[in-house]
Amino acid sequence: HVVVGTPGRVFDMLRRQSLRPDNIKMFVLDEADEMLSRGFKDQIYDIFQLLPPKIQVGIFSATMPPEALEITRKFMNKPVRILVKRDELTLEGIKQFYVNVDKEEWKLETLCDLYETLAITQSVIFVNTRRKVDWLTDKMRGRDHTVSATHGDMDQNTRDIIMREFRSGSSRVLITTDLLARGIDVQQVSLVINYDLPTQPENYLHRIGRSGRFGRKGVSINFVTKDDERMLFDIQKFYNVVIEELPANVADL
């Protein structure tokens, strides 16, 4: 049997003996960096305290912050570290552009202008907070744009329904956060917009890779304010790419 759950739910099931620790042979912590950055550290530690000592543990993470390494030191016995070489992280097939936005509050107008210009099959818009997901969703709907939204504060059933609608094509625009970026596998996604640049260069690949999956071509457009210029530079250096300014003939992309 395989049990999949959030740290809080898994800990609760272990505590109530709905999951018997002595029967568990393997524990996998996926998206460890995101889990830790979202405040699940205490719950993850509580789970490890209830697990039997001789258990196989796998920790998967796009990045290796100190908090993730601390888990390997505290709870793993002679762990083997497997790293993916940076040259295996590819953005091939994805056209990447940026748009200079002088002020944060002008991003919304820029986004609406793009949607009036581009011919889009399906697209994903990334922001950095759950609150901003809700805010941008309300603003877009207020301008008669049909959009869906998903983030970690929604219950799993609601998120599943939204993703089914998006995969089926009945919903064409999805607004979300980094936490869910790595689980979006939709073949028809042709455009990713970083309304907010990611806070870490490593997450850029997980975001814009949504538009180039399954060998398809894709486009990513990054909104860049003055405060974002350093991160844009870091992203280009990290992936050894040049991100061009969005051309005037944007409709031809």
Curated annotation (Swiss-Prot):
Q: Where is this motif: DEAD box?
A: 30-33
Gene3D superfamilies in alphabetical order: P-loop containing nucleotide triphosphate hydrolases (3.40.50.300)
The residues that cross the membrane are none
Record's Gene Ontology CC terms? cytoplasmic stress granule
Q: Which GO MF term does the entry hold, naming one?
A: RNA binding
Reply yes or no: does the keyword RNA-binding apply. yes
Superkingdom of source: Eukaryota
Quaternary organization: eIF4F is a multi-subunit complex, the composition of which varies with external and internal environmental conditions. It is composed of at least EIF4A, EIF4E and EIF4G.
Q: According to its UniProt record, which protein family does this protein belong to?
A: Belongs to the DEAD box helicase family. eIF4A subfamily.
Q: What is this protein called?
A: Eukaryotic initiation factor 4A-6
Q: Which organism is it from?
A: Nicotiana tabacum (Common tobacco)
Read off the lineage from the record.
Eukaryota, Viridiplantae, Streptophyta, Embryophyta, Tracheophyta
